[in-house]
Amino acid sequence: NGKPFCYGVFYHHGWAAGRSEGAALNAVSSIPKWLHGTDVVVVGHAHAKTGTKLAAFEPDWTCGQFRKRRIAAGITGSYMLWGSYGRERGYAPKEEGATVVKLSGKRKEAKIVL
């Protein structure tokens, strides 16, 4: 429609408890419950290098209804190879490197690229 738009992006060191990828995804998926207006949420800490799509309902004050906001959520990979810490504590090796967020310039759409 030619109208400008902007993205709400939240990057954080993160937190997660547990050894599974699911534990890390649970941590990142809880953020839109208390931080409204985000289109992209990316955290670290778990070093899981994964992503998912989330959704949240938010009030649209222009029409007095709720609308669904689509949220791209990701976790960054590690920047250390599987070394002493992970090996000594029995963690499985993780994927290294950044989680990339691709923002569309034509429509309001964000994707996590692994």
Regions found by a protein language model. Name each.
Residues 1-114:
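Extended recognition/assembly regions associated with phosphoester-bond processing machinery
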